[in-house]
Amino acid sequence: MIRKLTLTLCALVLMCTPVAAKTLVVAGNCAFPPMEFLTDKKVPTGYSIDYIHEIAKRANLKITFRDVAWDGIFAGLAAGNYDILASSTTITPERQQAFDFTIPYYGAVQAVVMPKGKKIDSLADLKGLTVGSQIGITGVFVLRKADVGAKIKEYDDIGLAFEDLAAGRTDAVICDDPVAKFYANKREDFAGKFSVAYLHKDPEYYGFCLRKGETELLERLNKAIASMQADGTEAKLKIKWMGSAD
């Protein structure tokens, strides 16, 4: 009986730690379907949104979600305006110097979208073309690093890049492959206009991003992610939002 009481008290102490007691603010840029976006009623939804809500259940966390602009999202986290980023945030060495990341919850590659039927063999084929992307995402970094002579046009919202592509004001868009496939295959207003012309070979991985030193919170998130991967919940979310668990 004493042992059972001790275990119960330990569990209660864990549940009443500061992380469990307060409501955590989760931020994301809801302009990146199918990962994070808004419904017609302006409700945040998508793969990352479903994922972080399931994490919260498993980790005994109270969360509220805030839609914020991508430009400045890291500054807001550093300033304490929110506690977690759930925004298709690629884990990079540069970002890891300033922030902590969970274990990966999704793997992506960069994709180039062009008018229907067009294909390219490498980023080098974008030489002389105008390529749209969103400010500060890894697609911009990848294209700049490749230095192929493309003109990069950056937008506040990836959707605006696709609108310009549809209107013929640009030649291509580069972004993460789930987003590229969504705009090429699932957006009714762009039906039949685009195709994924190229998939870059280098993989990148998304993690939930936190301020340095949030050790307890990081451990809770990682434990929940690992359990979701082990019991098939992650795969089910991939099928729901991307159509495949691959």
Q: What is each stretch, according to the model?
A:
Residues 22-88, 97:
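Extracytoplasmic small-molecule ligand-binding "clamshell" domains
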Residues 72-75, 87-97, 142-145, 171-202:
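A ligand-binding cleft/hinge motif common to bilobed small-molecule-binding domains
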Residues 114-131:
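Flexible hinge/capping segments at coil-to-helix
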